[in-house]
Amino acid sequence: MNNRVHQGHLARKRFGQNFLNDQFVIDSIVSAINPQKGQAMVEIGPGLAALTEPVGERLDQLTVIELDRDLAARLQTHPFLGPKLTIYQQDAMTFNFGELAAKMGQPLRVFGNLPYNISTPLMFHLFSYTDAIADMHFMLQKEVVNRLVAGPNSKAYGRLSVMAQYYCNVIPVLEVPPSAFTPPPKVDSAVVRLVPHATMPHPVKDVRVLSRITTEAFNQRRKTIRNSLGNLFSAEVLTGMGIDPAMRAENISVAQYCQMANYLAENAPLQES
């Protein structure tokens, strides 16, 4: 028997499809999401409706974004969900969540079992819409969740950690074994809750500058920032901000990265592209 076939659908490797089938895990995720009627609920990658059905049962209307044409067609003819669903058959990586929030008249509550092959770039895409999002609940590769929640001075701490925590409060919810999926992935999974900050704890003047600094620092994470960021900051400037130039990228807090970004935005602003 082909273990990539679930409910008559062949899981597509190119879409990173692994279908959730453990009822206890499904119930735990839905409980964590706690969907309520009247909320603007949006699911990314509903697949075979493992989460769509129990969430949809609690709602009058649910928006889903599904790239796979066959799966989108199955949802359109779903026996009890069909009339409740608004289906966008397109790539979430190019979806305009801001336009959808404006159309629905309220911030979105976004959830999904994200394809692991695009989870990190998709997170960055979603961060650009946090003004339009109330919260997010995602099943991700456990290693990605570890990176999202990691603090300074740890191996998991990186650019994703800094940018996620700049935009959101990041809360791990539960861990999920490979056996909860068909086909079973080769990695452990975990569910995470991300709640965009109502008030930014560390506001930056230009988030593009923060993105540039974190990219350059973590691309050379074994170097001291005196070397990795030497083209942006002198040792004297870093010391003046209370940041030791001998530290490495993983030693610098989110607050310090934001401090550096604001200095650069004031003293060497990026040109509008």
From Swiss-Prot:
It is found in: Cytoplasm. It comes from the Bacteria. It is an enzyme of class 2 (transferase). Its EC number is 2.1.1.182. Pfam families: RrnaAD. InterPro entries: KsgA/Erm (IPR001737), rRNA_Ade_diMease-like_C (IPR023165), rRNA_Ade_Mease_Trfase_CS (IPR020596), rRNA_Ade_methylase_Trfase_N (IPR020598), rRNA_adenine_dimethylase (IPR011530), SAM-dependent_MTases_sf (IPR029063). Its main location: cytoplasm. PROSITE patterns: RRNA_A_DIMETH, SAM_RNA_A_N6_MT. S-adenosyl-L-methionine binds at N18, L20, G45, E66, D91, N113. Disulfide bonds: none annotated. It catalyses: adenosine(1518)/adenosine(1519) in 16S rRNA + 4 S-adenosyl-L-methionine = N(6)-dimethyladenosine(1518)/N(6)-dimethyladenosine(1519) in 16S rRNA + 4 S-adenosyl-L-homocysteine + 4 H(+). Keywords: Cytoplasm, Methyltransferase, RNA-binding, rRNA processing, S-adenosyl-L-methionine, Transferase. GO terms for cellular component: cytosol. GO terms for molecular function: 16S rRNA (adenine(1518)-N(6)/adenine(1519)-N(6))-dimethyltransferase activity; RNA binding. Belongs to the class I-like SAM-binding methyltransferase superfamily. rRNA adenine N(6)-methyltransferase family. RsmA subfamily. Specifically dimethylates two adjacent adenosines (A1518 and A1519) in the loop of a conserved hairpin near the 3'-end of 16S rRNA in the 30S particle. May play a critical role in biogenesis of 30S subunits. This is Ribosomal RNA small subunit methyltransferase A. It comes from Escherichia coli O81 (strain ED1a). The gene is rsmA.
